[in-house]
Amino acid sequence: MKALFKEEAETRGIIVRVSASYLPEQSEPDRGRWFWAYHIRIENESPVTVQLLARHWVITDGRGGRHSVEGEGVVGEQPLIAPGGSFDYVSGCPLATPTGHMQGTYQMIAEDGSSFDVAIPKFALLAPAVIG
């Protein structure tokens, strides 16, 4: 399963795996718009159930411009993830440059009421012409 995902990070037994894909059909390079989809899997290898409450993304374009995005849950959900369970979702990111990267954190709450941040690994956003 790891082969599907290019990047991963682990915090307190919560593993976040990420893979990004360039979407040429939604991109308009001649208008300065490139678009990627990213697939995230959150796996709970801890002994307690956790709930994802919020997300915080830092998106950096190819010129070094940074944009911060915060919000409740992911794709309209605040999933509960039991020990041994996982949650997958797909979302997208536009940029005004053909390269960039994303990274961030998820705010989680454990069943005992304690909250903690889980790292989302840094992953590259690269348009194919830039790759090679």
Where are these regions (language model features)?
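Short structured motifs
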Residues: K2-L4, Y22-Q26, A54, E72-E77, ...
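Low-complexity, acidic Ser/Thr/Pro/Gly-rich terminal tails and inter-domain linkers that flank the onset
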Residues: K2-R33
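Terminal connector regions
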Residues: K6, P94-G132
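Hydrophobic core residues within well-ordered beta-strands of beta-rich domains
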Residues: I14, W34-W36, I40, L53, ...
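Short glycine/serine/proline-enriched coil/turn segments at secondary-structure junctions
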Residues: S27-E28, T49, A96-G100
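Asparagine-centered strand-capping/turn motif at beta-strand->loop junctions
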Residues: I42-S46
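Short acidic, flexible loop segments centered on an aromatic residue
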Residues: V48-H67
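Intrinsically disordered, low-complexity Pro/Gly/Ser/Thr-rich segments with frequent PxxP/GP/PP motifs
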Residues: H67-T99
